[in-house]
Amino acid sequence: MAVQVAKKTPLRRVRNIGIMAHIDAGKTTTTERILLYTGLTHKLGEVHDGNAVMDWMAQERERGITITSAATTVFWGGIEGSAKNGKKDSQEGRHSRIPEQYRINIIDTPGHVDFTVEVERSLRVLDGAIALFDSVAGVEPQSETVWRQADKYRVPRIAFVNKMDRIGADFYHAVETMRQRLGANPVPVQLPIGAEADFVGIVDLVEMKAIIYKDDLGAEWDETEIPEELRERAEEYRERLIEAAAEHDEEVMVAYLEGEEIEPDRIRAALRKATLELQITPVFVGSAFKNKGIQPLLDGVIDYLPSPLDVPPVRGKTLDGEEASREPDEEAPLAALAFKVQADPHVGKLTYIRVYSGTLKAGSYVMNTTKGVRERVGRLLQMHANTREQRDEVYAGELVAAVGLSNTSTGDTLVAVDDPHPIVLEQMVFPEPVIDQAIEPKTKADQEKLSQALQRLAEEDPTFRVRTDEETGQTVIAGMGELHLEIILDRLTREFKVDANIGKPQVAYRETIRRRVEGVEGRFVRQTGGRGQYGHAIINMEPHEGGYEFEDRIVGGVIPRDYIPAVDKGIREALESGVLAGYPVVDVKVELVDGSYHEVDSSEMAFQIAGSMAAKEALKRARPVLLEPIMAVEVTVPEEFMGDVMGDLSSRRGQIQGMDSRGNSQVIRAMVPLAEMFGYATSLRSRTQGRATFTMQFDHYAEVPQNIAEKIAER
């Protein structure tokens, strides 16, 4: 499919969005339909007879467009030859009310809990999102997690209540669960007409009219009066909508109080403002599978979600540690963030980049300020639904995939080589893996292949780690859950053709400290004929939320600048294996405060060892404790098994957080240590005759009770 790309879309007409959803809320279908209709708009310019359009859609549907790309670009609105020539009622003009063409970049976000990192990473680079909900289930556990992540990044959202054709579909219940379980402020801008098999259309509350679909492909519909039986409800919801708009717009408030009729455009502008301020979530409704409600949803993306100009400038620090920010302006200095690395069979390593400011040119050199290395940008590729397009340059606010960045990984910042004030954008913080598995190749010949493949996979995915166990010499892989590691193993055989044996999943314990220690010394001196070795470092160490931090507080050159990174490296090495049970140490801050060196005998190696010695000693003194992953568990269970299931969770050291009823089942929410959850699926099945289901996802690390910690340390 050839894609006509406008040379440059003004920033106000760009939308960078993601579709966030629970695993089965219908995300793939919704995304496919969006690609279908946006692809269709290109065809519509050429095709002036409705049948051809219908044929094309049927074909496209049979072929099924799927996204394998991390960012896909589509266009919507401003169809040539339809809205522009006044044929508003002709077939084509009905697809979008929007008179100009907008560029929508869709960033793919996975729905499974083991991939929260993927969601975090996409939320970081998108400006707005569509939150998808299943009209039967309403808010599900994963929807809550993703919603909380989107709150953290302050991402404005619109909601789409999908699957209105399903048995048990209940739009109003779904909206209520958004209010109760997410603490959101949902404002329906549409209501469904009918439900389940009788779902035939939508009431547009802004324009106060009904859209009744005439065909299965969602390409033809009639705009009519609102059905009599829905009139009263529509007026009640319209009233709420206007109130929500009035709260955020004084002119609308005045008009509302004086009982004036308010123009739809004015309402949309007020709702847009409230959405961008995260005060409300406009709610749309439809059935992607039945092709209903997708075009109005796309109009909603343009009406209510932000352009790069509507979000605050991206923040970071200069190399001196001063706060800095970059405005979304192509004339400004380049600042770009690599948000995903993907192995691609055709071009090798693809690095997906969001350009926040300035212009990125193919073939140019850039500086990776996170790592302090120069990189050459090879080709720049714009991904569309099923084609790639080469770009010579990419501007602020855009997303692109780059070929040739060999040293750049997820979360790295790229700036111009000659930038006098380079910036390092805020780093992405990824959760610690919670599950370990030993892995070995089936044949000795595969050893080299296996370690290369694992290295490649670890590059792509920051929550997947590979390490060698010091005591056993085994290779250990770690990830966010059993499914995560299963998929990694599947990719090993499928993409890298490596067969491996794996051990049983183990809990990935961590160690940390509980008190500050000062003036801890590491001194490495070796005098054996010829040149000696001399390294001496004095550190303070303290507990520190949010990972490892190293602070250089050396004054007066007592340790030369060149050796300071070596001390940091030595400390990091020491933290890989804690003093209690050899697990990695997390959440500590180390200050390098003093030390000494020898003109002749000092070397990087000596200071690395000194740093490592100081850190090991500090860990012993700083009250080390063992941490274990605690999982948020949700069990959906028929009433009669409630007591039994709750008793079982408590016996697994679980803490019950609360209960809800959902339909005729009860939902129990609990925090349970991962160590107690192995084999839970089988146990739950036998306790409830297979009628209960559960989901679990990592929530936080917590201190292991003393008696259990002692047993773990003895292993």
Curated annotation (Swiss-Prot):
GO MF entry, a single one: translation elongation factor activity
A Gene Ontology term for the protein's cellular component: cytoplasm
Chief site of localization: cytoplasm
Pfam family, one: EFG_III
Binding site for GTP: 21-28, 108-112, 162-165
Domain of life assignment: Bacteria
HAMAP family named in the record: EF_G_EF_2_B
Role of this protein: Catalyzes the GTP-dependent ribosomal translocation step during translation elongation. During this step, the ribosome changes from the pre-translocational (PRE) to the post-translocational (POST) state as the newly formed A-site-bound peptidyl-tRNA and P-site-bound deacylated tRNA move to the P and E sites, respectively. Catalyzes the coordinated movement of the two tRNA molecules, the mRNA and conformational changes in the ribosome.
Homology family: Belongs to the TRAFAC class translation factor GTPase superfamily. Classic translation factor GTPase family. EF-G/EF-2 subfamily.
Protein name: Elongation factor G
